[in-house]
C-alpha cells in the first residue's frame, strides 16, 4: 500500500521540462620572409591532402574570404579598418543575439533550482520509505533516486523549454566562425587564395596602421599579441568572479582557459598581424558583450527573466569583487 502511494506520488508530480545536461591553394612565398622561418614553414609544409590544406581550401573558409573581400570593396576602407569593421559587424549580428539567448536559457534554469531542490527532498523521503519497506540496498535506493530525479528534472526542462544544452549554441557557432575567419585571413596574408591572392596580399602589406603598417608581417613589438592575451585573461577573470561556490571541475576548466589565454601570446607573435588584429577585435567585442549582458536594462530589453543572481548595480559589484580578489592581496 505504501509503495503504491509512493509510486502514485511520483507520477503525480508536476510535469517538468528539464534537459539532459576544392583544389589546393597555390602557396606564394613572395611575402613569407616577413614571418619567422618556422612559422612560415608551418603554413607551406602542409602536404597535399593534409588537414590544414583541406581546411584552408574548404567552402566555409572560401566564404569567409569572399565576405572580407566584399566588405573591403564595398567600403573602400584600408584593410585594418575593414578587419575591425567586419569583426564588429559579425559579432554584433551573430554572436550577440546568441549570447542573449544563452543568458535567457541560463536564467530560466537558475529559476528552476528552488523547485528542483524541493522535488529532490520529497523524492529522497519517498525512496527512503520504499527502501525500508522492501529492504533495498543503499545502491538500489541510490540508483532509484537518481533515475527518477533525472526524469523529473528532464520534465521540468521540457515544461519551461530551457534545456541547458540550448545554452551551448553560442559555442557551436562562435568557435567555427573564429576558425574560418582566422584561416581566411591567413590565406589572404600569405597569398594562398584565389588568382588575385597576390594582389590582395600586397594590399594587406600596405593596409596596416600605427606600429603595424604591414598586416602580412608579425608584430615585432608584441603589442598586439600581449593585448590579445590580456583581454582574454580579463574575460576569464570576469567570468570567474561571477561564479560563487564553483566545483572542482569548473576550477579546472577556468585554469585551463587561463593557460590557453597565456599561450595565445607567443602564438600570436608568430602569425601575420592581420590575424592578431582580428583576434584582438574579437576578444574586445567579447568583453564588451559580456559587460553589456550584465546591464539590467539590456537584459530587460532582451526579455531575459530576472534571477536571484541578478544585481541592480552589476558594474559596481564587479569592480568591488575585482578589487577584493586582486588588489587586496597586494596590501
Swiss-Prot record:
Residues 1-63 form a transit peptide. CDD domains: 5TM_Oxa1-like. GO terms for biological process: mitochondrial cytochrome c oxidase assembly; protein insertion into mitochondrial inner membrane from matrix; protein insertion into mitochondrial membrane; respiratory chain complex IV assembly. The chain crosses the membrane at residues 165-185, 221-241, 260-280. It is found in: Mitochondrion inner membrane. Coiled coil: none annotated. One of its GO terms (molecular function) is membrane insertase activity. Keywords: Membrane, Mitochondrion, Mitochondrion inner membrane, Transit peptide, Transmembrane, Transmembrane helix. It comes from the Eukaryota. It is a multi-pass membrane protein. Residues 64-164, 242-259 are mitochondrial intermembrane. InterPro entries: YidC/ALB3/OXA1/COX18, YidC/Oxa/ALB_C. Residues 186-220, 281-331 are mitochondrial matrix. GO terms for cellular component: mitochondrial inner membrane; mitochondrion. Belongs to the OXA1/ALB3/YidC family. Found in a complex with TMEM177, COA6, MT-CO2/COX2, COX20, SCO1 and SCO2. Interacts transiently with MT-CO2/COX2 during its maturation. Interacts with COX20 in a MT-CO2/COX2-dependent manner. Mitochondrial membrane insertase required for the translocation of the C-terminus of cytochrome c oxidase subunit II (MT-CO2/COX2) across the mitochondrial inner membrane. Plays a role in MT-CO2/COX2 maturation following the COX20-mediated stabilization of newly synthesized MT-CO2/COX2 protein and before the action of the metallochaperones SCO1/2. Essential for the assembly and stability of the mitochondrial respiratory chain complex IV (also known as cytochrome c oxidase). This is Cytochrome c oxidase assembly protein COX18, mitochondrial. It comes from Mus musculus. The lineage of its organism: Eukaryota, Metazoa, Chordata, Craniata, Vertebrata.
Amino acid at each position: 500500500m505504501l509503495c503504491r502511494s509512493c509510486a502514485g506520488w511520483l507520477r503525480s508530480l508536476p510535469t517538468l521540462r528539464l534537459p539532459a545536461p576544392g583544389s589546393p591553394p597555390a602557396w606564394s612565398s613572395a611575402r613569407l620572409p616577413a614571418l619567422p622561418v618556422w612559422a612560415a614553414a608551418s603554413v607551406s609544409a602542409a602536404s597535399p591532402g593534409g588537414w590544414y590544406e583541406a581546411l584552408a581550401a574548404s567552402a566555409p573558409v572560401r566564404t569567409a574570404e569572399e565576405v572580407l573581400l566584399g566588405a573591403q570593396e564595398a567600403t573602400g576602407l584600408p584593410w585594418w579598418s575593414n578587419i575591425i569593421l567586419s569583426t564588429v559587424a559579425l559579432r554584433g549580428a551573430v554572436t550577440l543575439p546568441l549570447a542573449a539567448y544563452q543568458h535567457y536559457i541560463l536564467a530560466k534554469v537558475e529559476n528552476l533550482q528552488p523547485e528542483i531542490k524541493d522535488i529532490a527532498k520529497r523524492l529522497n523521503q519517498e525512496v527512503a520509505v520504499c527502501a525500508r519497506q522492501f529492504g533495498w540496498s543503499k545502491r538500489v535506493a541510490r540508483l532509484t533516486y537518481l533515475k527518477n530525479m533525472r526524469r523529473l528534472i528532464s520534465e521540468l526542462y521540457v515544461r519551461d523549454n530551457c534545456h541547458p544544452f540550448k545554452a551551448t549554441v553560442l559555442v557551436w557557432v562562435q568557435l567555427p566562425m573564429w576558425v574560418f575567419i582566422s584561416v581566411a585571413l591567413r590565406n589572404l596574408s600569405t597569398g594562398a587564395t584565389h588568382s588575385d591572392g597576390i594582389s590582395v596580399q600586397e594590399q594587406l602589406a600596405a593596409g596596416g596602421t600605427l606600429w603595424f603598417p604591414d598586416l602580412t608581417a608579425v608584430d615585432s613589438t608584441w603589442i598586439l599579441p600581449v593585448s590579445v592575451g590580456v583581454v582574454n585573461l580579463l574575460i576569464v577573470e570576469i567570468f570567474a568572479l561571477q561564479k560563487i561556490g564553483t566545483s572542482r571541475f569548473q576550477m579546472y576548466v577556468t585554469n585551463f582557459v587561463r593557460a590557453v589565454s597565456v599561450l595565445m601570446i607567443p602564438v600570436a607573435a608568430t602569425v601575420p598581424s592581420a590575424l592578431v588584429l582580428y583576434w584582438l577585435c574579437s576578444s574586445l567585442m567579447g568583453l564588451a558583450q559580456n559587460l553589456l549582458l550584465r546591464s539590467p536594462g539590456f537584459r530587460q530589453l532582451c526579455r531575459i527573466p530576472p534571477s536571484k543572481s541578478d544585481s541592480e548595480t552589476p558594474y559596481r559589484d564587479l569592480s568591488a569583487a575585482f578589487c577584493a580578489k586582486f588588489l587586496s592581496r597586494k596590501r
